[in-house]
């Protein structure tokens, strides 16, 4: 069995990292999702202390390997996406990260986006399908935190969810001695132009006292399906970090965001308590044509799904649907230029057929690649992983931070990701847009950006974002600005690196090449 790419090329740090992670994967006694499903038995896994010791040992070895490694990547030039435009949305001198974007299906020229950063968060809206943008402050005089997500409902209202943290927990556990944290939702009645004076809390731990846990990575989505009995409902899920575990909490609103139900747990299995030790990560949900909800997340090596058939009142027990590589690629020492990278799962649905799609990134091939799996039977069975990026396999080039969208008007599948295939040193990063017109069976890769960026311990956030309607695609991502002075790139992490700005990409597949 060949573990490392063969030939004259030297291995990059990420390639060695991924190969070593694969060795850990086959030697560490982790649970098998496939076996668990087949046997209908509970999954087994090592103790937290065993898993943590293994990761610490791996980190030491990987750092030593990385310091002596370089990459040799074949130069590849992609065709530019049709009608491609790239706009810098963050104002000069301001940094940003964790950007989100959405289009109003009932008024497709109305597009809204938001992002976090040193200014606490901004939003922007467009009334002409992204040709021009107006920047606004959705928080007014109040605070707004990170880990944003955004959606339109069936009335054209915009809902922006986010977390607000006064103080992180101790280094050992996110949920230990955290203060003043919670999940909030802001509302705009006019497509992002104006925002309500106050945010609505979904779950809040008050200031001035240690909280028993910390809330993180909230994701909001809406039921806009014409034939759904739950049309108009809003749904929100997030990670609840506790001192000994991580779980998924869920809530819903049946009155267009005015109030939210008391959150409850939908993850049957609890993950470890931190993202770099095998915790639950990357929650996202979608709604089928009949109103069925599908929520996915990552739990160690498992992609897990929870399903609700009654508008979020109840959920079936969550279950692993397939296994992936480790979703956490560590810090800048193991992923050149980027402070940390996660291969979190995203889910989307073809509203015409009910076909489900899940994307993620992992390093099963020796470097980080983007993958997609599909289900045509409401999530019961899933196709083998399809590699979305089409550069030569095992070439040492990394593709990462993918996001998924399905055009509800025609079923075309789009995946956006950072791409290093054109740099022999595996440092310069472009943004690529992949498109499938055959229900996710094959993909064509297009260049979205022309000029690459190179970071130095840059914090890009934990995700990018993507949306599509009627052949017009909108993406949002962060890019390092290499010609500026170093700043604190992640306030909660206390590390220094190159700052990032926020970019919006537009592609129009209605235009001929």
Model-derived regions, located:
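Cationic, low-complexity basic patches in intrinsically disordered or flexible, solvent-exposed regions
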Residues: 11, 36, 42, 56
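Extracellular, repeat-based ectodomains that mediate carbohydrate processing or recognition
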Residues: 75-513
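Boundary at the C-terminal end of the N-terminal hydrophobic targeting segment
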Residues: 32-34, 74-76
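Intrinsically disordered, low-complexity proline-rich regions
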Residues: 12, 21, 49, 55-58
């Amino acid at each position: 069995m060949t573990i490392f790419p063969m030939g004259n090329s030297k291995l990059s740090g990420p390639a060695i990292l991924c190969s070593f992670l694969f060795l850990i994967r086959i030697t560490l006694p982790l649970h098998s999702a496939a076996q668990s499903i087949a046997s209908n038995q509970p999954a087994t896994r090592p103790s937290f202390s065993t898993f943590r010791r293994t990761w610490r040992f791996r980190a030491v070895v990987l750092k030593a390997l990385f310091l002596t490694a370089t990459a040799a990547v074949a130069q590849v030039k992609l065709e530019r996406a049709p009608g491609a435009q790239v706009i810098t949305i963050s104002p000069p001198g301001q940094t940003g990260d964790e950007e989100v974007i959405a289009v109003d299906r009932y008024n497709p020229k109305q597009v809204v986006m938001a992002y976090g950063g040193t200014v606490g968060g901004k939003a922007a809206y467009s009334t002409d399908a992204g040709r021009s943008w107006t920047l606004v402050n959705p928080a007014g005089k109040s605070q707004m935190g990170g880990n944003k997500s955004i959606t339109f409902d069936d009335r054209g209202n915009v809902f922006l969810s986010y977390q607000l943290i006064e103080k992180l927990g101790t280094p050992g556990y996110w949920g230990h001695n955290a203060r003043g944290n919670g999940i909030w939702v802001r509302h705009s009645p006019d497509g992002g132009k104006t925002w309500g004076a106050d945010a609505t809390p979904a779950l809040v731990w008050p200031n001035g006292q240690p909280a028993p846990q910390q809330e993180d990575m909230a994701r909001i989505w809406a039921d806009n399906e014409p034939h759904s009995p739950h049309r108009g409902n809003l749904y929100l899920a997030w990670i609840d970090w506790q001192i000994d575990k991580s779980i998924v909490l869920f809530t819903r609103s049946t009155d267009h965001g005015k109030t939210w139900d008391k959150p409850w747990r939908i993850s049957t299995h609890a993950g470890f308590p931190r993202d770099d030790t095998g915790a639950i990560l990357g929650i996202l949900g979608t709604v089928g044509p009949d109103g069925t909800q599908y929520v996915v997340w990552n739990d160690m090596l498992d992609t897990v799904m929870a399903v609700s058939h009654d508008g979020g009142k109840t959920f079936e027990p969550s279950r692993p649907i397939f296994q992936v590589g480790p979703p956490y690629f560590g810090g800048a020492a193991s992923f050149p230029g980027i402070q940390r990278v996660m291969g979190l799962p995203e889910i989307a649905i073809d509203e015409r057929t009910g076909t489900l799609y899940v994307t993620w990134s992992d390093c099963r091939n020796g470097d980080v690649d983007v993958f997609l799996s599909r289900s045509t039977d409401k999530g019961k069975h899933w196709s083998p992983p399809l590699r979305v990026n089409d550069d030569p396999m095992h070439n040492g080039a990394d593709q990462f931070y993918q996001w998924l969208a399905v055009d509800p008007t025609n079923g075309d599948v789009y995946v956006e990701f950072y791409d290093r295939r054109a740099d022999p040193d595996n440092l310069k990063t472009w943004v690529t847009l992949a498109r499938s017109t055959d229900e996710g069976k094959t993909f064509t890769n297009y260049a979205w950006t022309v000029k690459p960026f190179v970071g130095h311990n840059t914090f890009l956030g934990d995700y990018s974002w993507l949306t599509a309607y009627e052949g017009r695609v909108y993406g949002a991502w962060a890019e390092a600005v290499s010609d500026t002075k170093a700043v604190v790139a992640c306030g909660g992490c206390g590390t220094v690196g190159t700052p990032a700005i926020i970019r919006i990409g537009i592609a129009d597949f209605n235009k001929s090449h």
